[in-house]
Amino acid sequence: MKNLKHLLILSLIVTLFNTSGVMAQETEETEAAPSFNFSGTVDTYFRTSFSEDPVAPGTSFANLNGFALGMANFIVSYEGEKSGFVADVVFGPRGSDAVFGSVGNSSELVNQLYAYYDIAEGVRITLGNFNTFLGYEVISPAANFNYSTSYMFSYGPFSHTGVKADFTLADDISLMLGVFNQTDQTEANYDRYTAFGAQLGLYGQYINLLAGEDYFQLDYTGGFDIADSFFLGINATTATLAGDTGFAGVALYPQLTTSDTFAIGLRGEFFSETDGFGALVDDGDADNFSLTLTGSFTSGNFTFKPEFRIDSASSEIFAISPTETADSLSSFVVAAIYSF
């Protein structure tokens, strides 16, 4: 009887051990394995304007004439169970323009460089340099529908160096809070400037805030699926600097996908500045309305984008010849983008 009792206890222990082993194995199998990734883009283009001098709109990127280079963008990332990092470097004219706030040396290559840690479920802390959370458009040409960029994107922040906390509050509700150096100052805080940022995400719509000494920007970025193949993106922003200087704008991005390989999209942007902000004029107030029509042909990882753009300003800001200025400008761009 005593031996039988010992046998039953031993059998129970073995059963529990095997069960816990299976459960541990199932847990290990369901947990995502750490991953190391290498990705990026390469882009190049041809640009011309329908004027005697090949002047370009005063927006970032895609503003060189004739056959021109965009950038090579290489991203190395590692994602573990609770932590990871991103190292994002850029080469070429577009990359140099994107990191214009760098003081020099190797930092001129750094587009993003940050590490993150999930301190709890739905709470992530990120430290380093990362692209901005404001605006509809981004630095990578593969992530934008239009190849040329808007005035709102061009004169808003490109990146921030600091710390931020991302909170997942519900399935479609998120909150980000951050403390940053001076906007676009990549390496360090050289002027003891501190900015504060916040983002509230509600069902795919985002309210963004960036504030610091002599700077305040409020931004809305979002969009709606009007139909299965028709999307409408929206961006609106207003920024106030020292004194009465500042800018504001709104843009609509209707995009129609006609097949697996072709889509067509329009960007209509109204942009205004006050007290010589400098995007359009150096003194006084000015505004500009632009229409950009872009086609997107895709084959695998390759995308071909022909684009026609018209800018119309409130004053003659475009130097269309050595002796003549105009209040409007028409441009044409053909871009090739490869993503991997």
Predicted segments, located by residue:
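Bacterial N-terminal signal peptides that target proteins for export
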Residues: M1-L8
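Outer-membrane beta-barrel biogenesis signature
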Residues: H6, G21-V42, R47-F61, N131, ...
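Outer-membrane beta-barrel channels and translocator barrels
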Residues: A33, E79-S83, A120-G122, A170-D172, ...
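Outer-membrane beta-barrel pore domains
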Residues: S51, G58-L64, G95-S106, G204, ...
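Glycine- and aromatic-enriched membrane insertion/assembly motifs of diderm outer-membrane
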Residues: A62-R94, L252
